[in-house]
Amino acid sequence: MTKNNEAGWNLDHSYTTLPQSFYTEIPPTPVSSPELVKLNHSLAISLGFNPEELKKEAEIAIFAGNALPEGAHPLAQAYAGHQFGHFNMLGDGRALLIGEQMTPSGKRFDIQLKGSGPTPYSRRGDGRAALGPMLREYIISEAMYALDIPTTRSLAVVTTGEPTYRETKLPGAILTRVASSHIRVGTFQYAAARGSIEDLQSLADYTIKRHYPEIEAHENRYTALLQEVIKKQASLIAKWQLVGFIHGVMNTDNITISGETIDYGPCAFMDNYDQGTVFSSIDTQGRYAYGNQPYMAAWDLARLAESLIPILHEDEEEALKIAQDEISKFSVQYEKQWFLGMKKKLGLFSNEEQDQSLIEQLLKMMEKFKADYTNTFRSLTLNTIENTALFESPEFKEWYKLWQSRLEKQEESKENAYEMMKNNNPSIIPRNHRVEEALEAAVTNGDYSVMEKLLEALSNPYAYATEQEEYCVPPAPTNRPYRTFCGT
């Protein structure tokens, strides 16, 4: 069933120009009684949709997979991935790309239904999703967007009227995810593992045309592609680290070629500053701990470089050298982006020899005194040094004098320095206990008002508004560490 186009659907299907080994065409599995519980109005408008039309029954049927919009071409994408270091052939096991929405400004975005039923890549899974994890992805991805961190976004969440079974019986839901594309490091691993250089080349050419058209004429465009992805990921991971975001499952199938954050399963934001912070219940070894994220990104990008070796140079030794040389640049690019970001968080404009040690000393003290990461920078920004173990310590008081002296040294006024800090230190993040509170109200009680209020606060993280203050309070100390789950 297809419907007419009053809502603003304008779908294209460039992904189907790739060899058919990269996808399987399959319709979504219908559900019994879909209900729209969340629609992203501003995103809908930017994509060229009419939000009021999207609330109608016929459109809700599309978000549920019970109907298809005009021009839809549903398919599940194939890819591979190193999951916690182990290589597997994977694919969309519970998601379908229904098409690429062409926006009024000529941009192209994937529209994907997540939780739309089983596919040939489901590996014994039911292809469904639970309401809690889908709402969680909506909240965190919108918070990331507001924090100016490249991310996939959520257009809608519908409940299915059917239960899904995980450890317990849970209400089912489908999320409509929007992404610049769903091409991953794992997509290239999939192509390389199949052994067809022609297919690998087709994927690389398609990716360049879609994401990096400026390098199409490059003498060695595949090396240039690797360089661009490294640059994007170095910037992305630096942004994660600067706000205390912990992804939790940085497998190669969750590293996008576009440089967007994807898959909000076991992610969370750090409260107390600790390099070893892990939230994911399945990350028992701390592989994807906060402090490891830059190293794991480099590891994942090395897998991309390996996959590209057959097309980097006709001589394998030369291709290997190119790959190694490019990967070695990641840490330099990441450090540069992170250092620049940390300087902004401390209001430092110019470059001084002492800047590195100022930053390192502060972080060391924060870890020692288990200081709240976000609130420490928030207090420095507001210049309200509260009564905490960190701020009361002699070493902090010494550091504070050095920092103030450093601010006075630069040409820019302190007023400008504090303004820059305000623009780079969010006063509010999606605190784990607040997110859980919103999910509990929505999933258990059918009360979405807690989530709406939280989303409103998170939509302007640099506002420093008084009405946001209740969301700045860290969780109460507890003996039980916060744990996240992947939702699959």
From Swiss-Prot:
Specify where the region named Disordered lies, as residue ranges.
Answer: 108-127
Name one molecular function that GO assigns to this entry. AMPylase activity
* Residue sites binding Mg(2+) per the record: 254, 263
Instruction: List the catalytic residues.
Output: 253
Which keywords accompany this UniProt record?
ATP-binding, Magnesium, Manganese, Metal-binding, Nucleotide-binding, Nucleotidyltransferase, Transferase
Which EC number applies? 2.7.7.-, 2.7.7.108
S-S pairs: none
Q: What residue ranges carry the coiled-coil annotation? A: none
Q: What is the top-level taxon of the source organism?
A: Bacteria
Which top EC class is named for this enzyme in its record? transferase
Q: Does the keyword tRNA processing apply?
A: no
Pfam families the record matches: SelO
Query: Has the keyword Nucleotidyltransferase been applied to this entry?
Result: yes
Please name the PANTHER family in this protein's record: PROTEIN ADENYLYLTRANSFERASE SELO, MITOCHONDRIAL (PTHR32057:SF14)
Which HAMAP family does UniProt cross-reference here? Answer: YdiU_SelO
- State the protein's purpose: Nucleotidyltransferase involved in the post-translational modification of proteins. It can catalyze the addition of adenosine monophosphate (AMP) or uridine monophosphate (UMP) to a protein, resulting in modifications known as AMPylation and UMPylation.
Q: What protein is this chain from? A: Protein nucleotidyltransferase YdiU
Organism source for this protein? Answer: Bacillus cereus (strain AH820)
